[in-house]
Amino acid sequence: MGTLYLVRHGQASFGADDYDNLSPLGHQQSQRLGTYFRERGLQFEAVLMGSLKRHRQTWEGIQTGLQATHLKPLVWPGLNEYDSHAVIHTIHPEPLAKPDTPELYKHHFGLLRKGLQAWMRAEAQPQGMPAFSDFVQGIQDALAHVRAQHSGDVLMVSSGGPISIAVGSLLGTPPESMIEMNMRIRNTAVSECVYNPKRTTLVSFNTINHLDADAYRDWVTFT
């Protein structure tokens, strides 16, 4: 039986023109996670990641901390995040102000929740995105690939949306509950699963043991 480690990317650049770019803290979080894995003696036989810049940057930080230059990741576009701007646009086509106050931040994520619900129910189709059923299938295909091709420790670097879909599908929860999981996944949090050729089973969700020290108290982020 193998172990699959689902990792959300490090802190990105929320509110900036280019969100798909780790912040300085995001790079630190990623490298710290790699160091934690190395200290635990983990040796990954494979790495899968989405094709977004923040996925690559997160893996590079993990790889540095892990000191595993020999590992070459398999890029899996099915692990990419949904386009939050496209999701919000389906229910609020007018431009939004940058969410740089608590009120605007809350408003932004309130709209995102409503847009995700509409997409999941097939009541709206965000431009440039797959149908929700196809989005789910891309994630399920990644899990199936791991079951079919591997038997040891595997690392998967993705985003909050795909990870919440993966966890929700393993637990059999309704799509709406996946939205709440999505909003709670912390940057570089680890969700651990065990797997064999027939099934994948969740062991833990959204853990940040690598940041469990006073020195890293301010490193816990959600965006």
Predicted regions mapped to residue ranges:
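Phosphate-coordination/substrate-recognition cap region in phosphate-metabolizing enzymes
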Residues: 34-111
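A short beta-strand-loop-alpha-helix capping motif that often carries His-Thr
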Residues: 155-166
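Loop-to-helix element that buttresses phosphate recognition and phosphoryl-transfer chemistry
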Residues: 3-5, 10-61, 128-136
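Short glycine/proline- and acidic residue-enriched helix-loop micro-motifs
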Residues: 99-134
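A generic secondary-structure signal
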Residues: 36, 141-145
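Active-site metal-binding loops of divalent metal-dependent hydrolases
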Residues: 10, 160, 206-208
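Acidic, low-complexity terminal tails and accessory targeting/binding regions
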Residues: 2, 74, 80-105, 133, ...
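Glycine-rich phosphate-binding loop signature in dinucleotide/nucleotide-binding domains
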Residues: 40-42, 146-151
